[in-house]
Amino acid sequence: MSRKHFLTTVLFLLTTCLLQAQETERQYLSGTGLDNTVTWQFRVSEGRNSGRWSKIEVPSQWELQGFGEYTYGRWYKKPGIKNPSMEEGTYKRSFRIPRNWQGRNIRLWLDGVMTDTEVFVNGQSAGPVHQGGFYRFSYDVTDLLKYGSSNQIEVRVKKHSDNRTVNAAERKADWWLFGGIYRPVWLEAKPAVHIERLAVDARADGELKVEVHLQGVTGEESLSMEVSPVSAKDAEHRPVKVTADSVQLLTAHFDGISPWTPESPTLYRLTVSLLGKAGNVIHSMNTRIGF
């Protein structure tokens, strides 16, 4: 098959309506930022307004919502002070998810919680305790959810970690200590066979490598990628047949791209599609990239 014929076929398959039908669906359980929050039930163990159930806005720092204790991060330099701000907070809320999500893969994402975090869905543990407050983490909650009916999430947070190295890196610093769910929380629904994540290496000469992490593939699928606004005639690309391995590598070269610079920060949209045996789009994922 010629390059031009292949790219024409790919562009036909990647029509807008088809992409919308197969893209990841997201449902927020919190707000999306400090100016857009959602109310959860909350109880803190020590400090202000402790020992009773109340309400808190999520995402936020619980100190700024009137809970717990303010402590300056260099407390360890002062004699006689040992491990202040040892509060533990518990968050709860109910939520519903669509019935048509049944049969899909559902992951619960927490974008940032300070510091140790344990999550329960409908009374069952979602997975191991997460330690560290500066990066997102997730759990596969597919089998824990009730589809089309009410669910409950409970998040237990320790302001100080049980891990001494985490405390040394995050708690003993020149800042005010804080605790809580301070970044968004959401659910992601994907097909059972899907793209889990992408690792992108884009070079200034137009060379592009994409490591595609897959879940549930059988070896009958294939992968395709598209970069916009790069036109089809400027693209050099071939289809990649998927093996049963969960990690696949896509490579391509794009002529005529505008490299990213501080003066001209040009961005492109990369779309990677997982195709079925008949050429149908099973799932697609897109992200912004710069060369």
Each language-model region and where it sits:
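N-terminal carbohydrate-binding accessory modules
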Residues: E25-T32, L198-A199, T271-F291
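Beta-strand-rich binding/interaction modules
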Residues: V121, E207-V242, Q248-L250, L270-V272
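Short glycine/proline/serine/threonine-rich loop/turn segments at secondary-structure transition edges
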Residues: W101-R104, L145-S150, H253-L267
